[in-house]
């Protein structure tokens, strides 16, 4: 049995401080056959979580301690003409635009959110945080 307590969280924060990425993952899966996303992530201010998405599943973000923003993005597609008057080629350019910022802080009663399937997102850590 795994207990999520102050001792475990303090240990994760200490390991995150030693990690150049300023974060530490704790895998809570109990077997190799378990392919679920069962992990704790200790995140320190300054960590960079690349903007990413999960095309086939939602992501539940539960903040156990700390303060952070979950930032959601949408794809913006633009088509531009490249070339001269003799040969025109159309280039497809994809960019991401921030559409929503969800502030999470358990002491303010804001415990988590659900990121929709396929939604681009990242986090901005305001103070040391642990998410499940």
Each model region followed by its residue ranges:
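General beta-strand recognition
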Residues: 50, 69-71, 130-132
């Amino acid at each position: 049995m795994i207990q999520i307590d102050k001792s475990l969280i303090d240990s994760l924060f200490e390991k995150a401080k030693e990690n150049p990425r300023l974060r530490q993952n704790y895998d809570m899966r109990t077997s190799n056959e378990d392919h679920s996303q069962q992990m704790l992530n200790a995140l320190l201010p300054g960590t960079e979580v690349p903007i990413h998405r999960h095309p086939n599943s939602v992501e539940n973000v539960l903040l156990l301690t700390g303060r952070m923003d979950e930032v959601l993005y949408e794809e913006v597609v633009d088509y531009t003409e490249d070339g001269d008057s003799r040969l025109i080629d159309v280039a497809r350019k994809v960019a991401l635009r921030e559409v929503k910022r969800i502030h999470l802080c358990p002491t303010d009663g804001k415990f988590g959110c659900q990121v929709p399937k396929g939604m681009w997102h990242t986090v901005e850590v305001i103070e040391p945080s642990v998410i499940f």
